[in-house]
Amino acid sequence: MSNVCIIAWVYGRVQGVGFHYTTQHEAQRLGLTGYAKNMDDGSVEVVACGDAAQVEKLIKWLKEGGPRSARVDKILTEPHSPRETLTGFSIRY
């Protein structure tokens, strides 16, 4: 088991449709730590840390569009080294 952290920016109809709440639920189900945060440009920023296979499952879920009410047009991901220790998976404002 190797642990990784990624940061992702999800673009499309992803705000006001419960996207960050369902992302939190999915990340918790996968045993990941991190957060989801609405950004000023209409995207959602997601930081996810944990087992590499579980992080990949979250990325796949994000690419597939998350909740039914959302529409994902584009997702960008890159490795990430959080400055703080992340516990649990939260929604940030």
UniProtKB/Swiss-Prot annotation:
Give one GO molecular function term: acylphosphatase activity
Acylphosphatase-like domain segment(s): 5-93
Q: Where is the catalytic site?
A: 38
Q: What class of enzyme is it?
A: hydrolase
Enumerate the catalysed reactions: an acyl phosphate + H2O = a carboxylate + phosphate + H(+)
Disulfide pairings: 5-49
HAMAP family linked to this entry:
Acylphosphatase_entero
Q: What is this protein called?
A: Acylphosphatase
Q: Which organism is it from?
A: Salmonella paratyphi A (strain ATCC 9150 / SARB42)
